[in-house]
Amino acid sequence: MDSSFSQKIVVLGTGGTIAGVTTGAPELGRYRAGEVGIEEILRNSRLVGVKPHFELMVEQVCQIDSKDLTVEHWQVLLSRVKAALLNPEVKGLMITHGTDTLEETAFLLSWLNLTSKPVVLTGAMRAFDAHDSDGAQNLRDAMQVLQALIEHRMGGVRVVFAGSVYPGHWVQKTNAQSLNAFQSGPNDDRAELIEWGANWRPRDFEPPADVWPFVRPNLNTILERGTWPRVDVVMSHAGLVGGSVLQALVEQKRALQNPQPSAKLGVDLEGLEGLEGLVVAGTGSGTWSESMREPLLELMSMGVTVVLTSRVPWGHEELRGHPLLISQESEDNFLEDLAKTPLNSQTQALFSRLQPLKARIALALHLMG
């Protein structure tokens, strides 16, 4: 394209089903993700409607099945996003992504609150060469939404999928097969249907209030660090005996802090990073099995930061009685105290609403701050 164009849109490809190719009988729905490059995907999608004053700058960041997404992939993606956002000629970004972890990347970009420029993510539920592939239409919709956001000077992170626009902070994959695979609330009340027409403009989603009680790390800090702190997720569930997973984490943490006896415990420490944070996906409105009490206390005594949230996707927006962040300085009777503690800060309510995997990202970023 003509390099004299002053307005650019960056398109970053990362693989996923939208880049997948079918294997075997089409009716079985089997495919390999991340096989097709972003240039070919864009050519196939016939991106009609790209306005003449926009130039597309296309880059292949990675070609993976998004279930295999790593921190290293995120680091590369963040570096490319940073480069694009620092370029005054770039007006917006589109990222193609596998749906399995799309919500995590969307949350990461939204939580970092990088820029006033719009970022749109999209993907597909059917492979690139499937007869019923939805990727091309999702791409066309995403490009139209991105251009509308640019023209209305609206920033933020959004996911465009199956004719709807979702705020990056709240979006969640809720269906493993349907083309309409995402939601952003119990009644999808945070989603916006795309209504094409001369006067249509995207809704200006209100971003989450910036009440996270700790400083979010600067993007440069994240990129310079390279590695992220290890943060795991454990779930409270029926039949939990002795907090078995937690107990294993305790034994591992002990061995890392005192490696000499580790051989006796049968703990292999090679290549293992010490646990720094733990997200507990509690039941209901953020409750937990009593059997988790002692191992949680021991992990906290060894310096692990513990965050409580709920495994239930919706309905705990107004959690009562559960401060979210628990530091190792908390008293031993913290679990009993939690039940007596009224919700007295906006901070607790906001972080309570985070689903476990998003809470994990927020906690990891906090530990880097």
Question: What spans do the regions from the language model cover?
Answer:
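ATP/NTP phosphate-donor binding region
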Residues: 1-84, 314, 333-341
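Internal gly/pro-rich beta-alpha loop/helix module
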Residues: 121-200
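Short Gly/Thr/Asp-enriched flexible loops that form oxyanion-binding sites at enzyme active sites
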Residues: 95-117, 288-297
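Accessory alpha-helical/coil subdomains and C-terminal extensions
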Residues: 6-8, 12, 24, 37-50, ...
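C-terminal non-catalytic interaction/assembly regions of soluble proteins
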Residues: 265-268, 282-369
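A glycine- and small-aliphatic-rich helix-loop capping segment at beta-alpha/alpha-beta transitions
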Residues: 24-35, 101, 107-119, 135-141, ...
